[in-house]
């Protein structure tokens, strides 16, 4: 083939390849592969709710608990304040880091922290917002702001882990719900070998193998089969990455349950699924932290 004809053929092939790539980028398949908008999904799930704790959410701890506000570090010159709950009259022992849901540290999260403390854990509810949301719209904005600055959130979580270690924690786990479920997973990434167990309730997954390489702890996940905002298939992809590299992730999927099925203050509360998940979470934490 003459040289000019060869060049022309190569140019034509390159143009065709670029056109194909452009077509794929604009195709429905490419759109499906884009990262989901979890903030919008959370707004859809919680848009008709309020941050107020229902009477059912105020489940009393099994044993006496002491709760107080503590400063667990600083970030960009601002004090990081969280709620510390622990069995009355105790110091040290196994500890849990509990990131809040998308409302911030409200009464529901305080009750959750106290309930885990009633099971014998020192519990630190960390504040990733620096405030609480009063409406779904303000919660969505706080959620989006936090996810736009993940490095700051991870430094926040790292400060909480360091504080628990200095306070005498013999082992540390992380438990979170919704937005907090995603951040309990990130606590596992940040903490490395310092975090011995991660429990995720319907939290957004991370499927990138490089990002998950930091995770050393076993993971348990609790998800509703009807959750369209965080589909079970997306979480199974994370599970596949973890198990494929020799780590452990156990999933419990509840038929008929939706997102936030374990939140007694929410419209999707499913008492049967929530009770089952609670028992399984406690067994998982006991096996890995005690």
Language model segments and positions:
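Short alpha-helix in the alpha/beta-hydrolase fold that links the catalytic acid
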Residues: 112, 231-241
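Primarily recognizes the serine-hydrolase "nucleophile elbow" in alpha/beta-hydrolase
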Residues: 158-216
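Bacterial N-terminal signal peptides
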Residues: 8-27
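Acidic catalytic loop of the alpha/beta-hydrolase fold
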Residues: 226-230
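Short beta-strand/loop motif that positions the catalytic acidic residue
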Residues: 215, 221-223
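Short beta-to-alpha linker loops that shape the active-site pocket of alpha/beta-hydrolase fold enzymes
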Residues: 128-132, 204, 257
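C-terminal catalytic histidine-bearing segment of alpha/beta-hydrolase fold enzymes
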Residues: 243-290
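Serine-hydrolase catalytic machinery in alpha/beta-hydrolase-like enzymes
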Residues: 35-63, 69-165, 265
């Amino acid at each position: 083939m003459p040289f000019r004809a060869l060049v022309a053929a190569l140019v034509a092939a390159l143009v065709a390849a670029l056109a194909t790539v452009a077509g794929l980028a604009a195709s429905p398949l490419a759109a499906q592969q884009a990262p989901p908008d979890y903030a919008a999904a959370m707004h859809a799930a919680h848009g008709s709710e309020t941050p107020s704790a229902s009477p059912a959410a105020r489940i009393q701890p099994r044993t006496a608990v002491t709760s107080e506000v503590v400063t667990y570090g600083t970030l960009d010159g601002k004090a990081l304040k969280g709620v510390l709950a622990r069995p009355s009259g105790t110091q040290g022992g196994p500890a849990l880091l509990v990131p809040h849901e998308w409302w911030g540290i409200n009464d529901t999260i305080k009750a959750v922290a106290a309930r885990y403390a009633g099971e014998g854990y020192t519990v630190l509810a960390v504040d990733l917002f620096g405030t609480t949301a009063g409406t779904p719209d303000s919660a969505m904005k706080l959620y989006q702001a936090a996810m736009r600055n993940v490095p700051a959130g991870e430094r926040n979580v790292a400060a909480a882990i360091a504080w628990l270690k200095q306070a005498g924690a013999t082992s540390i786990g992380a438990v979170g719900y919704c937005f907090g479920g995603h951040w309990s997973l990130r606590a596992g990434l940040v903490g490395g070998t310092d975090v011995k167990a991660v429990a995720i309730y319907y939290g957004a997954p991370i499927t990138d193998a490089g990002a998950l390489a930091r995770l050393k702890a076993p993971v348990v996940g609790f998800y509703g089969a009807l959750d369209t905002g965080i589909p079970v298939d997306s979480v199974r992809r994370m599970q596949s990455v973890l198990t494929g590299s020799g780590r452990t992730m156990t999933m419990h999927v509840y038929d008929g349950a939706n997102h936030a099925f374990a939140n007694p203050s929410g419209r999707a509360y499913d008492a049967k699924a929530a009770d089952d998940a609670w028992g399984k979470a406690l067994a998982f934490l006991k096996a890995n932290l005690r």
